Amino acid sequence: MTTRIDQFSAPAPAGPVNAWIVGDDEEVIVIDPGSDAAGVLDALGDREVLAVICTHGHADHVAAALEVAERDEAPVALHPKDRSLWRDAHPGEDADIEMEDGGVFEVADVRLEVIYAPGHTPGSVCLYCEDLGAVFTGHVMLADGPAPQDGEYPDFAGQLNAIGEYLLPLPADTRVLPGQGPETTIAMAEKNFDSWVAAGPGLGG
């Protein structure tokens, strides 16, 4: 069976967010399920969910996490530094797995490596799948630059550092699959990086 990446667009107040489904016809991992649990579950069909991974704790990315995971009793993974953000969406609940830099998830015949990349939030992570030539960047990096939060950057310098230190060294043809908007490549991000630095925090305005 061929391992593939499927995309599901989940509605959100600031515009649709990208839920990513990685796996084959038997089993999958769901990345950032958004807020439309019914829509994600419909897209999954009868494929088994091995894990639900949240790249960060903002509600528009994690609201459906528990409901999607519950169907197959799958664990939910989140970096512990985003626990307080997670609890805004899920009071009294905790994620099952506390992700760390370098952690690995396996699904079908591929591996997803956790890249700790704080800046957008204290616990933001990316997930690199060398086997499929893709990196899932959440809101660390969109096609047009670092993702703001409500038009502002809590830690613009930290976010740029995460991009420059952890993402740009990946192979140039790596697909960048963000938490919102269209995909891009590492090559395009590297080409645009200096302009993002020059624009500063006003980039998101």
What is each model feature region?
Residues 1-47, 126-138:
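Conserved beta-strand hairpin/beta-sheet module of binuclear metal-dependent hydrolase folds
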Residues 3, 108-113, 123:
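Short beta-strand or tight-loop elements
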Residues 4, 18, 27, 95, ...:
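A generic secondary-structure signal marking the coil-to-beta-strand transition
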Residues 6, 53, 77, 97-99, ...:
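Hydrophobic/aromatic beta-strand patches that form the interior of the parallel beta-sheet core
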Residues 10-12, 96, 116-118:
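Short Gly/Pro-enriched turn/cap motifs at secondary-structure boundaries
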Residues 14, 28, 35-111, 141, ...:
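Active-site HxH/HxHxD metal-binding segment of metal-dependent hydrolases
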Residues 18-20, 97, 102-103, 125, ...:
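Residue-level detector of beta-strand structural context in well-folded domains
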Residues 28, 116, 122-205:
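Metallo-beta-lactamase
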